[in-house]
């Protein structure tokens, strides 16, 4: 997986790890917000990688972005 992603709502996140759910062994993405209090989140990998429909268009929930692009946004915040 790439390191930085832009959520469809616009915020930037950094993927820290891929973990396993203890009961189901499902892959989980551990990721950190690059804004505010820099909260750490976990979400099923399948959901992290899925496409969603928004305003009649199918888009990725999290779009990979370059480290350079992420740094530009992070430095503005």
Predicted regions span which residues?
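Mixed-charge, low-complexity intrinsically disordered regions
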Residues: 1-77
């Amino acid at each position: 997986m790439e390191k930085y992603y832009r959520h469809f709502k616009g915020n930037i996140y950094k993927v820290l790890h891929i973990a396993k759910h203890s009961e189901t062994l499902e892959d989980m993405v551990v990721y950190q917000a690059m804004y505010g209090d820099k909260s750490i989140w976990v979400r099923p990998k399948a959901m992290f990688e899925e496409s969603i429909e928004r305003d009649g268009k199918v888009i990725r929930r999290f779009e990979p972005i370059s480290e350079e692009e992420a740094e530009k946004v992070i430095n503005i915040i």
